[in-house]
A protein has these predicted regions:
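Conserved "HGTGT" condensation-loop signature of ketosynthase/thiolase-family condensing enzymes
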Residues: 1-109
Length: 109
């Protein structure tokens, strides 16, 4: 899941995924691009498409300290890209003024 940002209270945001949460990657490419304002969602969606195409999950960079609120069993893809089969991916974008979008994409077989 490509997140526009990683939430502060992780448990509340990811509880809907139940056990699937521990089988997936969560990342934020915004950590590498900065905030691109109106282009942020498009760039994040392109990154998600490339992740599906190349089976590589890009990292969330610049994570240097452990946060006690982060479950260590959740794969946030910190600081290093990970190769894995990516068949389905979701990109979330939450913009200024309440402009929110979630796009789910899958690999065509």
């Amino acid at each position: 899941m490509e997140c526009h940002r990683l939430p502060r209270n992780l448990a509340l945001h990811f509880e809907k995924f139940e056990d699937h949460l521990y089988k997936m990657n969560i990342n934020s490419t915004k950590s590498m691009t900065g905030h691109l304002l109106g282009a942020a969602g498009a760039i994040e969606a392109i990154s998600t498409i490339l992740s599906i195409q190349h089976n590589v999950v890009p990292p969330t960079i610049n994570h240097f300290t452990d946060d006690e609120s982060i479950d260590p069993n959740i794969n946030f893809t910190f600081n290093k890209a990970q190769e894995r089969v990516v068949n389905v991916a979701m990109s979330n974008t939450f913009g200024f003024g309440g402009h929110n979008a979630c796009v789910v994409m899958r690999k065509l077989v």
